[in-house]
Amino acid sequence: MKGIISQVMGPVVDVDFKDYLPKINEAIEVNFTVEGNTHKLILETAAHLGDNRVRTIAMDMSEGLTRGLDAIALGSPISVPVGEKVLGRIFNVIGDLIDEGEEEKFDKKWSIHRDPPAFEDQSTKSEIFETGIKVVDLLAPYAKGGKVGLFGGAGVGKTVIIMELIHNVAFKHSGYSVFAGVGERTREGNDLYNEMKESGVLDKVALCYGQMNEPPGARNRIALTGLTMAEYFRDEMGLDVLMFIDNIFRFSQSGSEMSALLGRIPSAVGYQPTLASEMGRLQERITSTKKGSITSVQAVYVPADDLTDPAPATVFAHLDATTVLNRAIAEKGIYPAVDPLDSTSRMLDPQILGEEHYKIARGVQAVLQKYKDLQDIIAILGMDELSEEDKLTVDRARKIEKYLSQPFFVAEVFTGSPGKYVSLEETIAGFKGILEGKYDQLPENAFYMVGNIDEAIAKAEKMRA
């Protein structure tokens, strides 16, 4: 059905139809020419203004659009390619390839606006999602089909953890991952693509990018594009998929820009009045069903370090676990720089993990907390002033700290150490031994950058030789 553009206000475009009214979220296509180049622009219907006029949000730059241009209603929402063919490729918000690779014909396409799975289809089992990363599996384990927040400043290693998770899911669980770059820097997206290519995980992951320079419509809907691809793997192929959203804050931020452009009255701190429901719609689709699961890791930017800001506060309500990266730990050379005391998980429960895992996790945290409390005394008076018991606690805490480091597969290029995947059983056994004092005689450097505890013992013997 043909309409005519009646008004262009940046990323917001009004279209008049004669005897047809596009539904909310229906896609509308506009073809126009700028300086001899033909452009295709997709608009998404956002509001009905009366008299068959609709207000739409542009999914790309609207420079060169003029009033009077023809706009064709496509009769359905934006649909994007799904299935195994999407692996190893980069898509934009409307599902077009943007990686300069060869053109591909996609026979399967799904609408990006979908209902979350029905209650009776959802799985209520609490299962642990083994990542092979010691610090995560022991202290803040991920739930299968759960949502994890990855908090950290610039350069602390968020991207490396994301790539390691993609690697471990691909090689240990032979699973697929989907990465949605929401309001990302183009450079970071490019780096991620090249690093994945080098580390050999690219053919197990689909990438969807809506970069920082794009209009708010593209930055907002790109999260749904990625999620739709992940849903296909879960619902049609019965797989356990890993879904990365970097950065979930930009999803709320672009929603707030769209809301203002559409003329809605803002709520707290200028955010859209529908912030909680938009976030809920996205997050409710990320879940476990009886067929498969989507486990999501979402990087969360906290504006001005204010955790009470409505955008991060809305995300918190949905998270099952938080992985907090700490610059102070990275400065000690301990990678992954996950803070063992700040990271949390609802899975840390004896009924889910079992008594032994829970006891050891809490024991490790208690030793590290005691060490933290003693640090002021050590700084002022030195180790000699501590009681024998405290000296032993400090010694074990330093070993635990070192043992929480781990060589990553995707970091082999710059560490020179082969990556290690440590199973949950090995992780628990290793930390249990340290807490019980089995390895008190080993030097603490033997625990640095190793996989399981046997490697630490072998390293200690090598150091003695």
UniProtKB/Swiss-Prot annotation:
This is ATP synthase subunit beta. The keyword Ion transport applies. It is a peripheral membrane protein. GO terms for molecular function: ATP binding; ATP hydrolysis activity; proton-transporting ATP synthase activity, rotational mechanism. The gene is atpD. Belongs to the ATPase alpha/beta chains family. It catalyses: ATP + H2O + 4 H(+)(in) = ADP + phosphate + 5 H(+)(out). InterPro entries: AAA+_ATPase (IPR003593), ATP-synt_VA_C (IPR055190), ATP_synth_F1_bsu (IPR005722), ATPase_a/bsu_AS (IPR020003), ATPase_alpha/beta_chains (IPR050053), ATPase_F1/V1/A1_a/bsu_N (IPR004100), ATPase_F1/V1/A1_a/bsu_N_sf (IPR036121), ATPase_F1/V1/A1_a/bsu_nucl-bd (IPR000194). Gene3D superfamilies: 2.40.10.170, Bovine Mitochondrial F1-atpase, Atp Synthase Beta Chain, Chain D, domain 3 (1.10.1140.10), P-loop containing nucleotide triphosphate hydrolases (3.40.50.300). One of its GO terms (cellular component) is proton-transporting ATP synthase complex. Produces ATP from ADP in the presence of a proton gradient across the membrane. The catalytic sites are hosted primarily by the beta subunits. It comes from the Bacteria. NCBIfam families: atpD (TIGR01039). Keywords: ATP synthesis, ATP-binding, Cell inner membrane, Cell membrane, CF(1), Hydrogen ion transport, Ion transport, Membrane, Nucleotide-binding, Translocase, Transport. F-type ATPases have 2 components, CF(1) - the catalytic core - and CF(0) - the membrane proton channel. CF(1) has five subunits: alpha(3), beta(3), gamma(1), delta(1), epsilon(1). CF(0) has three main subunits: a(1), b(2) and c(9-12). The alpha and beta chains form an alternating ring which encloses part of the gamma chain. CF(1) is attached to CF(0) by a central stalk formed by the gamma and epsilon chains, while a peripheral stalk is formed by the delta and b chains. SUPFAM superfamilies: C-terminal domain of alpha and beta subunits of F1 ATP synthase, N-terminal domain of alpha and beta subunits of F1 ATP synthase, P-loop containing nucleoside triphosphate hydrolases.
